[in-house]
Regions:
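C-terminal cap of thioredoxin/glutaredoxin-like
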Residues: 2, 6-13, 19-37, 41, ...
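Structural alpha/beta surface segment adjacent to cysteine/selenocysteine redox centers
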Residues: 22-130
Length: 216
């Protein structure tokens, strides 16, 4: 049977992307589709103008949301939603808002080499659970190695500009397709925006599998 293609548009500083990724993975497992789907990660930088070195998270979030207290309230809401999915958000140790271009390039590299499995979740966990700076190349090399990628190959890749043009093109195409926020997931002909309940993913897979059966 032909594999069901799914497109996942994420940014690795988006907490709802991690929550959506966990819900989607659970549904895929529950439906026994782990070997029947072909997932493609599409990059989307929420902060494309972020300095390469990132910013102090307190300063950035205070400026963005008007106060640190408001930012903390939003973080608490996310952490509660994450706990329901078995995810740990340790915002107290997250002190940087990183530029995520390097992280997106790393995933692009891993997908090209057929070894992106586990890397996406590892990046989310490194940032939200462990407070690691995923805008730092040395940190990304460690995360990649922990996820099973060759550290020397990743080091050479991140030291180059390879993939940057492709990332920009993928982001531009996503915007042309009407994607204005993340997470955004396409399963068959169904586009799902936001961290929706499991039932929404189940319905999308039911529609997509039914369409594939008709085609075949």
């Amino acid at each position: 049977m032909k594999k069901q293609e799914i497109t996942l548009t994420y940014d690795f500083i988006c907490p709802w992307c991690w929550i959506a990724e966990r819900r989607l993975a659970r549904v895929v497992d529950d439906l026994g589709l782990a070997d029947a789907v072909d997932a493609r990660i599409v990059p989307y930088e929420l902060n494309p103008a972020m300095p390469v070195e990132g910013m102090d998270r307190n300063a950035y979030r205070t400026a963005k949301f008007g106060s640190w207290a408001r930012s903390q309230a939003m973080d608490a809401h996310v952490a509660e939603a994450g706990r329901a999915e078995g995810l740990q958000f340790h915002y107290a140790i997250v002190d940087r808002t990183p530029n995520t271009l390097l992280a997106h390039r790393l995933v692009w590299f891993a997908q090209r080499n057929g070894n992106a499995s586990g890397l996406v979740d590892a990046l989310f966990g490194a940032y939200f659970r462990d407070g690691r700076d995923i805008g730092d190349a040395a940190v990304l090399i460690d995360i990649a190695a922990e996820a099973g990628l060759d550290a020397d190959a990743v080091t050479a890749f991140l030291a180059s500009d390879e993939g940057t043009t492709e990332i920009r093109a993928l982001e531009a195409e996503a915007i042309r397709q009407g994607i204005g926020s993340v997470p955004s997931m396409q399963i068959g002909q169904t586009v799902i925006t936001g961290a929706q309940p499991d039932a929404v993913f189940r319905d999308a897979f039911a529609d997509a599998v039914g369409a594939l059966a008709i085609i075949e």
